[in-house]
Amino acid sequence: MSARATRPRSRRGRHPLPGELDPVAESSEEVDANNGRFETKPELHQEYLGPGLQSPRNWIKEGCDVGSHAVLSLSPEEQCEPEVEAHQVLQEAPLDSGPAEISVPSVYETLQCRLSSLEAVVAALRHHSLSFPKSVEAEDRDQGAPGPFGDEKEDAGPGQQEAARLIERNAWLRLALCNREDELACTQASLQDAQAEKETLQRQVQELEDSLMQMEASPPTPILRAGRRNSNSSTSGAERRPWVPQDSSMAHPFLQRLRSDSSTQSFGCLSTQHPAPETYLMEDQMGQLQGSIEKLKCFNRLLLAVLQGYKGRCESLSIKLAKREAEATALRLALQYSEDCEEVYEVLLALKMAGLGTGVGTTKGDLQAAEKEASRLLMKKEATMEVETPQPSSEGSGVDKPTPEELASQLHGYVQHLRERWALVKIPEELGPVTAPKATMPHAEATVQAILEIQPGPTLPHLEKSQIQQDLAATRDRLADLVLRLQLTQREKRGLELREAALRAQGPAHQLLLQQLRWERAHFAGDGSSGGSSEDPSSEEEAGEDRQQHYQGPLALLDGQMGKVWDSENVSQELSASLARAIDLRAQLQSLRQQLEQVTQKGRTRRVQSAELSRELCKAHSALALAFRGAHRKQEEQRLKLEQQVARLQAQQAEELAVLTATARALGKPGAPQPAQTFL
């Protein structure tokens, strides 16, 4: 091992805290060891170095005096001040603070100490790198070139060795300087991050101060009043300080960071030596804010847990909803196939009724209607079926129309096709009993209320599935009632429209009758006025005038009255015709109403019959489905049994084949001849 590796190493800057690694001290051990080596051997400095290279302090002074940066020279005391201050701070910290503060070091204090030590080391290394080459060149010039004599070689040997060692040390110091510059850049970056964090902390402190000012402006809370009453009863005067948590480990991390801030520590001694009532009030409010923050954190964690629970429930409900939607789709398809089968059965029933009772009570029109309905269903079948080839329509082709028997056979094929489609649909099983939800949410709500320290208020409304189903059923009932009312209103509207049409038809007839009555009244009024004027002898002038009017009137209106009489006869004929037409319309309206009632009654009976038929068909379909499933299950079991038998037979055949093969090989292979046998 080299002498440099065996020398003791010293630490600079500060003493490391227990359980903490000091990267600055570890990386600067070699430089400190070399500096210590030069300090322990002053005779080497004075013997082999020049007068300007006797100590590192002289190197620093010469570097500052001769350097090209024009930097003011610093005394050794000024250069060592950051390190001494760091040592004093670190030596005073364990005395003032307990083990809890040592276990949680201050980030800013550590950064300041490391930065000051790094600046001092970098300055020393720069001055060393500037002074070492000059001192070595001066020493070489003073000593001169080595002579051929042995005494000069012996005198110059130690100097050359020392110069080589110094050159090697200079190269090593340059490498260490590069490493330290990298470390300094990293430290500056971390310092910038720390400054940014410090700014954020200052903003948070400003926000806290604003909130504290708002709290001061607001009325005091009951907890603060109780704390003040307790503090007034227990202390007096300047000792009225509210209770704060003494354990530093239980304090909030934000408060610890505020306490460890270098900007706040610079005023720590003054605040502890001369406390003020505002400081106590601030600490009281900070304690309350800390409690509120912890309470809000607990509440936030609880809300997150409740949210996770609700999220899981929502996911499970979404899965169940997707399953129910698939089941509803399957049921819808099955219902559609059942309705199609119902229509086909109705058409088949109509065809059979028309075919059996052609001479009893049915007409040819019913048979034609049934055939048209069957043709429509067959066209629908051709449109919906994808695999089968479409059949040509009977209307556009020259082929004769199919007979009812052919239509019935085709409809039976359509029914078979619908049954096959219906069998492919997976019908869900019957729903089991609805399980009651777990009582986890009320417990969570009670915990939330306990954390918030509020009185238990009204519980949140819980909508269970049964209640939702009841509300949905009630809504459906109301909707059905509204639909029924709408239908009744529409029927009343149709009746009113029919009455309005009848009244509109009667309007011209009534107008003609009104005109005839007015004309007759005017005519009778004219006759009466003429008779009265002839009988009145009161005045001769009036009698003469009346006579003139009486005689001139008929003479003047004779031709017009004949036309009016002729017109009145036409009007009376038209009026009688309109009255007869109105009577006919009323009779037709009455007959139409009766027919409508009959049609509605028939529709109701048909609906009832179709409902019964659909129920029977559903039962038949369910029975067929069960039978089909049973047959399919039996067929599967038989197939499995046959496959097992085939496998066993194959295994037996393989074994027999192997035995036969071995026997054949044994028989075909010639054995060794016996003593009494020959090959012949």
Curated annotation (Swiss-Prot):
Residues 179-218, 363-386, 467-506, 573-662 form a coiled coil. Keywords: Coiled coil. Residues 1-51, 134-161, 220-247, 384-405, 524-549 are annotated as: Disordered. The keyword Coiled coil applies. One of its GO terms (molecular function) is PDZ domain binding. It comes from the Eukaryota. Pfam families: USHBP1_PDZ-bd. Residues 1-15 have a biased composition (Basic residues). Interacts via its C-terminus with the first PDZ domain of USH1C. Belongs to the MCC family. This is Harmonin-binding protein USHBP1.
